Swiss-Prot record:
SUPFAM superfamilies: Cystine-knot cytokines
Keywords: Cleavage on pair of basic residues, Developmental protein, Disulfide bond, Gastrulation, Glycoprotein, Growth factor, Secreted, Signal
Molecular functions (GO terms): growth factor activity
Family listed: Belongs to the TGF-beta family.
Main location (coarse class): secreted
Tissue: Expressed in the dorsal marginal region of late blastula, becoming restricted to the Spemann organizer at the early gastrula stage.
Propeptide residue interval(s): 19-274
Location of the protein in the cell: Secreted
Gene name in the database record: nodal3-B
Protein name: Nodal homolog 3-B
PANTHER family: NODAL HOMOLOG 3-C (PTHR11848:SF295), TGF-BETA FAMILY (PTHR11848)
Oligomer status and interactors: Monomer. The propeptide region interacts with bmp4 in a non-covalent manner.
Amino acid sequence: MAFLSLFLCLVFSSPLMAMPPALQGRKAISPASILKGPSTDNGARDFHGRKFPHFMMQLYQNIISRRDKDLSNLEHPTLQESDTVQSFIAKSYTTVGNHWTLFFDMSSISTNNELKLAELRICLPSFGKSHSVTVEIYHTKDTKEKLFMGSFKTKISSALDADCKVFNLTMVLHNYLIRGKRLIKDEYIQAKGLLLRDLEKSAAEKGAENVDTLKQDKHHVSDFAAERIILVVFAKERSQAKPDPPSLGKQLFPLKYGMADNANKVNGFRRLRRNKKEKTRMDVGTTPPKPVEEIKPKCRKVDMFVDFQKIGWGSWIVYPKAYNAYRCESACAVPLNETDDATNYSYIKSLLPLSDTERRECPSCVPVKMRSMSMLYYENEEFILRHHEEMIVEECGFKDI
């Protein structure tokens, strides 16, 4: 699964343009990679005292193990079109009778990304009779300022299975982020699971707590929200006029690297392609001296292990802690032969007289095919899953720079 070409489910994919000022904030930068890692009984592992959202860990496991069948009908196609998955753990919540209010800090949703899918996932034990619940979604950076995003109604009933209840909030986020409108809709979506706790209060209880039932106990909210209430946003970085793969360095150090305009780059000459079916000898006037028969080192791929801890990125990278990026190496082997993976220019240049040291240049042994890598990292109290292009060398070849 050429994942992301990688990441996430597609439901609604209108471009994410201007973001309301109330949602503008820090940018989602820094990427980190993920390798398969051990999980605890509840499906999460501690990282700087934080628990991984179970869904994010499960999603990563599905990606690296290519388990397409474990993804929903929405998540599978979106994963093919997205390159970033962000998870937002609920900062707090209130429950008054059949009225649910959830608060998230969505400041890091980038205006450079195209929204693909937004899912609200709630996993609570269920009991009681079937009843309707109104759910309101708010954006908040602190408890003082709260921005209403939208609401929907859904029917809650008891269930025996262990699935979480999943709501598609793509329209809610899109409607507000793009148009600045709140979305209030009944029967918004048919949920995937049926496992919300029946928190309906008695009439006496409702009257007693008419004011504010915000859960203030931090330990309770943290434990509850980390595994129970999570907003997952699937997105793709908006392509530029002349698209280039997103740079890991530019995302890590945006102030250090300028976003140069590549539109005026001169296109390289289209190189001639040799007819490999017919071995045609080229007449260069003078036959170059035959080299001494010896085993010349080819342009080859060798190991290059990257340890994120050693380069100072270990504090926020979740998976992998290290990986083999590989590199290309070769001695200066001239003239090249037809079996070498080289450009026509490199081949012609290597036929120059070996005695002409001033005109003799060694072709560069460089990566000619790269592979992407999925990465999981912890940034600004959020777990982010991102797909980065050109992270691992697949093939090496001779090339003139």
